């Protein structure tokens, strides 16, 4: 696959920049409403030639729902496939990511997949550790190892902002506790979940996460297996079917790679055996995806022939 050049990335960014005007910030988490909606950055981390980047690629932003892929991998390592999927399903849903509907109407009552909020909360409740400090340190260690960036931390400001307004997520937790999906203290779980969502990265970090998943968990620079191959395959399957909220089907048609988005404006994607892509554009479309980020991935996929379909 031919290498993309930095000036090509810069041209594509300029081409899609007008789309940022059509999107809106995620103001329901107050701290996210302080982002600059015009920001747009991209990085591509290749297995051989390191990375190229353009735009606001070194601006820090929080993982938000992108963290769901990280904690799913950790939970599978900690608990194994059989236990994890006894509590959380494997099917996509057409409902909003924070909906409670399927929990009420599906029997047995369990979240349909790990990429919706109910499923992600259940996954976080499975992480090993004696307390939240140990669990959060494990999450940070995992992200630092995948990104090869020991400075990565979380934003307590964003975590607190999210914790104060997370009424719907609390209701999902109480409903799941009633039905035996989770058995931990709800406020403890909410504290950990909001911190995992508030882990800060930039596009280069995100692209490196994408590279590790593109290489089935193998780090071509450290020359070691970081995540077991079978776990990355499970994660990437969910990224294809559920990774882009209610646009996952359209994204599969228009872009056709495993990807996961977050409401802070991040998207990471992976091109199997080749590269990872990290994007930041906090102006979101109606489904909660970076509007310009979606467009630049669509253009790159068409140009480079990335689609797995």
UniProtKB/Swiss-Prot annotation:
Where substrate is bound, by residue? 65, 117, 162, 169, 193, 245, 263
MF (Gene Ontology): glutaminase activity
Question: Which Pfam families does this entry report, sorted A to Z?
Answer: Glutaminase
Give the source's domain of life in one word. Bacteria
Known EC number: 3.5.1.2
Which residues constitute the signal peptide according to the record?
A: none
Query: Tell me, how does this one assemble?
Result: Homotetramer.
As for family, the record states:
Belongs to the glutaminase family.
| Listed name of the protein | Glutaminase
Originating species: Bacillus cereus (strain 03BB102)
């Amino acid at each position: 696959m031919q290498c993309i050049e930095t000036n090509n990335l810069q041209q594509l960014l300029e081409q899609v920049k007008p789309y940022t005007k059509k999107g809106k910030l995620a103001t329901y988490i107050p701290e996210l409403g302080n982002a600059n909606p015009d920001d747009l950055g991209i990085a591509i981390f290749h297995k051989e030639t390191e990375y190229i980047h353009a735009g606001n690629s070194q601006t820090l932003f929080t993982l938000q729902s992108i963290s769901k892929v990280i904690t799913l991998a950790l939970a599978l390592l900690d608990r194994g496939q059989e236990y994890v999927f006894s509590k959380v399903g494997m099917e996509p849903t057409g409902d909003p990511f924070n909906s409670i509907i399927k929990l009420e109407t599906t029997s047995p009552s369990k979240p349909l997949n790990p990429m919706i909020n109910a499923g992600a909360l259940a996954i976080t409740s499975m992480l090993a550790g004696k307390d939240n400090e140990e669990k959060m340190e494990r999450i940070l260690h995992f992200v630092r190892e995948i990104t090869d960036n020991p400075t990565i931390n979380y934003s307590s400001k964003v975590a607190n902002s999210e914790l104060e307004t997370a009424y719907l997520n609390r209701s999902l937790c109480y409903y799941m506790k009633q039905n035996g999906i989770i058995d931990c203290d709800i406020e403890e779980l909410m504290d950990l979940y909001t911190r995992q969502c508030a882990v800060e990265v930039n596009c280069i970090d995100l692209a490196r996460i994408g590279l590790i998943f593109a290489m089935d968990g193998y780090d071509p620079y450290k020359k070691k297996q970081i995540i077991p191959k079978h776990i990355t395959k499970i994660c990437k399957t969910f990224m294809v079917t559920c990774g882009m909220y209610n646009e996952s089907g359209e994204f599969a048609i228009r872009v056709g790679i495993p990807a996961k988005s977050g409401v802070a404006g991040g998207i990471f994607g992976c091109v199997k055996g080749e590269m990872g892509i990290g994007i930041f554009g906090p102006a979101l479309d109606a489904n909660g995806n970076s509007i310009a980020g979606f467009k630049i991935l669509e253009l790159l996929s068409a140009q480079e022939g990335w689609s797995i379909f």
